[in-house]
Amino acid sequence: MNIIHQVNEAKVTSNKPLPALLSASLLTCIREERILFDRLSFDINPGDIVQIEGPNGAGKTSLIRILAGLSRPYSGHVSYCGETILACREEFNADLLYLGHLPGVKSELSAAENVDFNLTLSGYQDFDTQAALAHMSLAGFEDALAGHLSAGQHRKTALARLLHTQCKIWILDEPFTAIDKKGVEQLERLFLAHVDNGGCVILTTHQDMSLIKAEQLRTLTLDYRSL
């Protein structure tokens, strides 16, 4: 998707394209003397849903950690709105929501306390925790200790923050793990609403999606070869 920014001032129009929301430039990743991907380049624009796929060990998690700035590539760089993420770390982090394959839920806190903790840690003040949990089908579990919740409820507790975040870039590692079909559809609707508002979603998953159609989804396949 090419986003064109037009400035009308004194009857002058500029058709200069905006930089991509997130760009990978010639990324190479080597783990344990094995090349996972080599010279990988792509742009992710507002409105994009990108699924990273490939066999186990192909480098999916390594790639999304590099995109999130949590790992360094062997070579190449990642840019946010035209600047390398190393040069604009604060701005990039403020616009990024990353959820790893582990839900990151604290077992000694309740479901509501976990949502409050994560959103407050991200700088948010005005949010409706109960509404977020209800949207994730966790109404009635607000006060339940996370340590007593199922794996699917853990994942939903972690994902509840998506309801209130203002970050444009969502990077999610296996967000559908342990979630039933209804829960997957709830998340798909959330993804579609997010990209309709100018955000982007980057995810890994082994599950099929029923609401996000093929024409709405970009796929990036890692297969151990130079890309």
UniProtKB/Swiss-Prot annotation:
| Recorded superkingdom | Bacteria
- Membrane topology (UniProt): Peripheral membrane protein
Q: What does it catalyze?
A: heme b(in) + ATP + H2O = heme b(out) + ADP + phosphate + H(+)
Sites binding ATP sit at 54-61
Outline the extent of the ABC transporter domain.
Answer: 21-227
One GO BP on record is: cytochrome complex assembly
Gene Ontology terms, cellular component aspect?
plasma membrane
Provide the function of this protein: Part of the ABC transporter complex CcmAB involved in the biogenesis of c-type cytochromes; once thought to export heme, this seems not to be the case, but its exact role is uncertain. Responsible for energy coupling to the transport system.
Family as reported in the entry's similarity comment: Belongs to the ABC transporter superfamily. CcmA exporter (TC 3.A.1.107) family.
Query: What's the name of the protein?
Result: Cytochrome c biogenesis ATP-binding export protein CcmA
Q: Which organism is it from?
A: Shewanella denitrificans (strain OS217 / ATCC BAA-1090 / DSM 15013)
Question: Taxonomic lineage of this organism?
Answer: Bacteria, Pseudomonadati, Pseudomonadota, Gammaproteobacteria, Alteromonadales
The encoding gene is ccmA
